[in-house]
Design a protein with these regions (language model features):
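Outer-membrane pore/translocation modules
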Residues: 147-256, 312
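Surface-exposed strand-loop-strand hairpins of Gram-negative outer-membrane beta-barrel proteins
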Residues: 90-119, 138-149
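Transmembrane beta-strands of outer-membrane beta-barrel proteins
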Residues: 89-100, 128-134, 158, 171-175, ...
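Residues that define the transmembrane beta-barrel architecture of outer-membrane proteins
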Residues: 112-118, 150-156, 169, 214-220, ...
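Structural signature of outer-membrane beta-barrel domains
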Residues: 103-107, 131, 135, 139-143, ...
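Outer-membrane beta-barrel biogenesis signature
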Residues: 17-99, 104, 109, 161, ...
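Outer-membrane beta-barrel channels and translocator barrels
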Residues: 125-131, 139, 165-169, 229-233, ...
């Protein structure tokens, strides 16, 4: 029995050794690991500069039209200038001007007569400051009493005006000469009425145009003028010297020296209307034959005043005016001179 028990114990031990060892008890199933995607690229080392965050992309450029350069404002127009009546303008201009004076007077017996003196001037600028000019004249006289009536084409004038503004001041110089071809020469067999018309024309024009009526003389004319023009106001003065040299006939003075001067004041009541007045003075600087004949002929003083309209026609100006003038001393007061001037300048 003992032997049988030993034999069975040995067999059991041998079977236990041949059987595989039992594994440990199974553990709870672990959660699945996250799936990763392997990138099969080689990553270069990252530098410090690359480690900075990338700059935001620049916004797309918007197409904007470049504005045109600013246009300069137009220059303000020059202040309005009151055009004088018989003084010379202190501007170089393109102008055609018809200027007529009707004078009424009496002779020593109190009989009335009249004179119409007409001037026509043309001027054209060759530079902004220089304007050559030509001036023509005609006079018609209805003499009082038994004196003969007459007409005369008087000496033309050829010359030039040089004018420049200096702030509100305008300066001008004038140089001209007469062409001694006028009618009424005392050395020719002309109608005596033309001689009388020339003498009457001098007084009708306040003695300011002596050179044109001195038909026997070649005259050199030189003058200067200055005007203050601002705020609708004009104040102008001028002075002129005339040197006359006889070139026709053998009688009379071989030479004479005359002078004229004047002052003009004007004001614009509205842009289309101005009022102007001027004082005019003429004096013989030499003892010319008229002075020797009667000392009161040495000088004349007149005063004129009147309105002038100003009409802009496109780029042109029409400035018609009318003035009344009266003599302030002899011989004009002796003959009771009253003068009306109609002035029609057209600037283009």
């Amino acid at each position: 029995m003992v032997a049988l028990a030993i034999t069975m114990l040995g067999a059991a031990r041998a079977g236990a050794e041949e059987a595989p060892a039992a594994g440990p008890a199974p553990e709870a199933a672990a959660a699945p690991a996250p799936v990763t995607v392997a990138v099969a690229t080689e990553t270069a080392p990252i530098t410090l500069a690359q480690a900075k965050p990338a700059a935001a992309p620049a916004p797309a450029a918007t197409a904007v039209a470049t504005p045109p350069p600013p246009v300069a404002s137009p220059a303000p127009p020059p202040p309005p200038y009151s055009l004088p009546w018989q003084l010379r303008p202190v501007v170089a201009a393109n102008v055609i001007r018809s200027d007529s004076t009707v004078a009424f007077y009496e002779n020593a017996a109190g009989v009335s007569g009249s004179t119409v003196a007409t001037m026509l001037l043309g001027s054209y600028k060759v530079t902004p400051y220089l304007a050559p000019l030509v001036r023509l004249g005609f006079v018609q006289n209805s003499a009082p009493g038994a004196a003969p009536d007459g007409t005369s084409f008087i000496n033309p004038i050829v010359g030039a005006t040089y004018a420049r503004p200096v702030g509100p001041i305008r300066l001008a110089g004038f140089l001209a000469g007469t062409v001694p071809i006028g009618q009424g020469s005392t050395g020719t067999a002309m109608n005596s009425g033309a001689v009388g018309a020339n003498s009457a024309g001098i007084l009708a024009r306040s003695g300011m145009d002596n050179a044109m009526y001195a038909v026997n003389y070649f005259t050199v004319i030189g003058g200067i003028a200055a005007a203050y023009v601002a705020h609708g106001f004009t104040a102008q003065v001028e002075a002129t010297v005339l040197q006359l040299t006889r070139v026709r006939t053998s009688t009379g003075d071989s030479s004479r020296t005359n002078s004229t001067a004047g002052m003009h004041l004007g004001y614009f009541l509205i842009p289309q209307l101005s009022l102007g007045g001027e004082l005019r003075y003429q004096r013989w600087l030499s003892d010319a034959a008229p002075v020797k004949a009667n000392p009161v002929n040495r000088e004349t003083v007149t005063l004129a005043i009147g309105p002038r309209a100003h009409f802009k026609l496109g780029k042109n100006w029409f400035r018609p005016g009318i003035s009344y003038a009266r003599g302030l001393d002899k011989p004009l007061t002796t003959a009771s001179y009253n003068m009306v001037q109609v002035d029609l300048p057209f600037a283009f």
